[in-house]
Amino acid sequence: MNRASAVFLDRDGIINRAIVRDGKPYPPVRMQDFEILPGSVTALSQLADFGYTLIGITNQPDVARGTQSREMVESFNALIQSKLPVREIFVCYHDNADDCNCRKPRPGLILQAAQKYQLDLSNSWMVGDRWKDIAAGQAAGLKTIFVDYHYSETYQGSPATYIVEETFSIAPIILKGSK
């Protein structure tokens, strides 16, 4: 059986707009703050049309911290899946102190998705806007694209395979790499 190639996508900042405060990105808290990025609509449609399986991978520690409800996170994810060709969104609800394997920069969620959907990680990609996204992708053996919004945080780890400044730029890079 042939394994499918996938594009793993961080949620906040890649699929939907992150809320930036003091130079740091945060997930939206209320539905009225939630906005799917226009560039992601175009890019993800192109990738799905080419045959990539699209999977969301997101850390949502605000649930563990008590500042966001799991129901609201699930509502955002359901809205994404109703508007975009994203197969599933895998979520880590743990905080840093929980030391779990699913929280990026560890690759646990990527590996779960790969097993569930029989994905070929050697021909797959991770797209993210923070160093933890890129590190998780690299740990899983993926090619990586860092969408650099110039947040006020230090990039840690190895450089991404590619660096872009907008989500809409990811599709041409990935599709060119597929030929």
Where are the regions that the model predicts?
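Flexible, glycine- and charge-enriched loops at secondary-structure boundaries
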Residues: 29-37, 66-70, 103, 160
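Residue-level signal for short segments within beta-strands and strand-turn junctions
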Residues: 17-19, 93, 148
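A short acidic, helix-capping loop that chelates divalent metal ions and anchors anionic groups
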Residues: 24-27, 63-66, 96-100, 153-156
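Anionic group-transfer/hydrolysis microenvironments
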Residues: 12, 61, 106
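Substrate-recognition element of Asp-dependent hydrolases with the DxDx(T/V) motif
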Residues: 40-73, 77, 86-98, 137
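Asp-based, Mg2+/Mn2+-dependent phosphohydrolase catalytic module
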Residues: 2-3, 71-88, 97-126, 130-179
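Active-site neighborhood of HAD-like aspartate-dependent phosphohydrolases
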Residues: 1-55
